[in-house]
Design a protein with these regions (language model features):
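Conserved catalytic-core motifs of GNAT/GCN5-like acyltransferases
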Residues: 88, 135-138, 150, 155-172
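Conserved GNAT-fold acetyl-CoA-binding loop/helix
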Residues: 33-60
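Conserved beta-strand-loop-alpha-helix junction that forms the acyl-donor binding cleft
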Residues: 110, 136-146
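A short beta-loop-alpha structural element at the N-terminal edge
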Residues: 20-32
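Acetyl-CoA-dependent GNAT
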Residues: 51-108, 119-120, 125, 179-180
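Conserved GNAT acetyl-CoA-binding A-motif
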Residues: 126-138
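C-terminal "cap" of GNAT-fold acetyltransferases
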Residues: 18, 99, 162-180
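Conserved acetyl-CoA-binding loop-helix of GNAT-fold acetyltransferases
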Residues: 111-124, 147-151
Length: 180
């Protein structure tokens, strides 16, 4: 992996200002999986222990629908640089207005406002999707994500202590929630 110079960072930041958020297409899925797999070794974002494949995750991708539980990508200059998806929180009818969201950003574009833009879009468009409550499940040691959700009006609604075992370390899972 090459280092990012300050000149490279400026050009990436300029590109970030021109983000388009759109529905994900199957064509985007290999890039979506690459972004996801890059987080696996960090042990900060996902409970997956090994990278996954497009084939293994395609059924999950196909469960989304643009009108209720969309899957969006953030695109800049024709390149997918991040994504956000809505999932059913629980399968019971009374939870119909609650969605769990996940957001992932290409490692070269992190800390440049991509996740914030995706989350703001989710908050803003949630009601038109029939969503009244958004929940994010975030590892308690993932402080950057917790701070971002906090800045966007999410509150810590719960903590599941020691629920995930990553490399022989038990990790807590924070439940962040917000009405929209």
């Amino acid at each position: 992996m090459s280092a990012v110079t300050s000149g490279d960072r400026r050009s990436q930041t300029a590109a970030i200002e021109q983000i388009v958020i759109r529905d994900a297409l199957e064509f985007d899925f290999p890039t979506i999986i690459d972004i996801y797999n890059a987080t696996v070794p960090t042990r900060m974002v996902t409970a997956e222990l090994e990278p996954t494949t497009v084939e293994a995750r395609l059924p999950w991708f196909r469960e989304h629908s643009p009108d209720q539980h969309p899957f969006w990508v953030a695109e800049s200059n024709g390149r997918v640089i991040g994504w956000l998806d809505f999932k059913k929180f629980l399968p019971r009818c009374a939870y119909r207005g609650t969605a769990e969201i996940s957001v992932y950003v290409d490692e070269h574009f992190r800390r440049q406002g991509v996740a914030r833009r995706l989350l703001e879009e989710a908050i803003g468009r949630g009601p038109s999707l029939g969503i009244t409550t958004i929940v994010g499940l975030i590892f308690a040691h993932n402080e950057p994500s917790l701070r971002l959700f906090d800045r966007l009006g999410f509150e810590r609604w719960g903590l599941l202590p020691g629920i995930a075992r990553l490399d022989d370390v038990e990790r807590d899972l924070a439940i962040m929630g917000r009405r929209v």
